[in-house]
Every structure is written in C-alpha cells, then in structure tokens.
UniProtKB/Swiss-Prot annotation:
Cofactor binding remark: Binds 1 heme group per subunit.
Residue runs in coiled coils: none
A Pfam family the protein falls into: Trp_dioxygenase
Record EC number: 1.13.11.11
Chain positions recorded as heme binding sites: H242
Catalytic EC class: oxidoreductase
Subunit comment: Homotetramer.
Protein name: Tryptophan 2,3-dioxygenase
Residues given in the record as substrate binding sites: F53, I54, V55, Q56, H57, Y115, R119, T256
UniProt keyword terms in alphabetical order: Dioxygenase, Heme, Iron, Metal-binding, Oxidoreductase, Tryptophan catabolism
Organism of derivation: Kineococcus radiotolerans (strain ATCC BAA-149 / DSM 14245 / SRS30216)
Cofactor annotation: heme
Pathway: Amino-acid degradation; L-tryptophan degradation via kynurenine pathway; L-kynurenine from L-tryptophan: step 1/2
Amino acid sequence: MSGTAEENTREVEAGVVTDFTREMSYGEYLHLDELLAAQHPLSTPEHHDELLFIVQHQTSELWLKLVLHELRSAMRAIAADDLKTALKNIARVKHIQRTLTEQWSVLATLTPTEYAQFRGFLANSSGFQSQQYRAVEFALGNKNAKMLDVFAHDGPGHAQLTELLEAPSLYDEFLRHLARRGHDVPAELLERDVTKAHVHTPALVATFRVIYEDAQRYWTEYEACEELVDLEENFQLWRFRHLKTVERTIGFKRGTGGSSGVGFLARALDLTFFPELYAVRTEIGS
C-alpha cells in the first residue's frame, strides 16, 4: 500500500525563522561562503579525488586549531593550579585526537593510481609544513628550533611557533604544579631551558612512583598523569595511522616536501612527550 508525499514530509513549524533580511543566518555565522570557497584543486584537467585530498587536510587543520585552543587553556589553568579545568581541556583534546585518527580511514580510500594522477600538482607542499601541527608538538614539548626555518616565509606562523618554543610546555607546567604541591621535582627540570625538548630524567620517575603507589592520597595528580598518558598514546596512534596511510598510498617514495617519506614518519614514533610517565610503569610494584 503506497502512501502520499505529504505523509513523508515534515512540515516547517510556524515558529521557524525563514526571513534573514535582518537576522544573522547559519551560513553567515560560520562564514560558509569563504569556507566552502577555499578548496581549489590544481590538477588539469581537474581530478575527481583531489577534492578529497584537500578537504581531508583542511578539516584536519580546523581540528588542530581547536586542539591548540584547548592546550593553551590547559597550560594557563595548570599554571594557576586549576587542574580541574585543565583536565576538562585535555579530555576534549582526546576526543579530537580520536576524530583526527579516524579521518585517515577516509583518505585511505584514495588508491595509489588515483593519487599519482594529481600528486605532481602539489609541488613541494607537504603536511610537514603544517604550522599548527608543529605548534601542537611544541605545546606538548617536542621542541626543535630548527623547525622554525620551514616557516620563515610565514610571519604570523613563525611568530606563534617562536612564542610556543620559548614558553613552558604542557609537561613543564605540570611538573611546576607538582612542585608547588610539595612533590619532589628535580630542580634541573624546574629551571631548564624550555626551548629544548624534554629529556628523560630518572629522578622524576621516583616522584611519579610515589603518586601512583598512593593514588587515593594523590588522586588529582594521579588522574592528571593518566590523562597525559592518554594524550601521548592518542598522538602516537595518529602518527602510526598517518604512516600506514602514506605507505599504502605512495609506498616508499620520497615525500613531496623532500623527506624520505615512510622512513621519516617511522622515526617520529620513537619521539616521546612524557617519558617518565611510561618509565614509572616498570617500577610500580617492584
């Protein structure tokens, strides 16, 4: 028995606003005209799958913008000894990380044959040049002043990275917070050159062991430690999915930005933000 079109149509309620001559619309609030006009495939003739490649990376950049927003808030909160706010920020970052990691499954639908037909139009542009990705790494403590050279052409981007390079990282702020709470944090870490990457410090492992083995007493610190481990693990999962997506798409070709490609990405898996939080696991209960 067939129905009617009216039965399968939702009526617009009387209270729904339809006149936007004097009101701000959804599209205006989000600046959708500019956002949806920002995809400019360069392949000639235009290749169908280049739009996928562009949208994948543009949406990633939007999520990275939000990650930075939340990490900056978390660092300010920790500096003010407001760990509850910081943990809320970090929880949101973790959800964004999972979204970013899952997005690789969309790009993985791009076959090697399809990508090869427009890859040459990328010239030397590469995700390695993502200023926001580098900013996230700096905020988490993986700092390298040489990376600034890549952004010499980008005044505002270079300035933001310089600011993050010279500021304490999320981990630096957390260790300072622990010291203010009376935990035994080595002075060398509290006074270190924050423009350098954090180096594994065995003496700090003992401090974390105290927290982990008396979690009820130090519950807030314990919870924060586990949140940081989640943060790093999610980041490593993103790196791994990136590597495997690149491998299945271009094999072991060199990257468009001049890197060795998969080999270069694989070495990033050895980098760590919070090494003592992993090292302490060997010590607990022993």
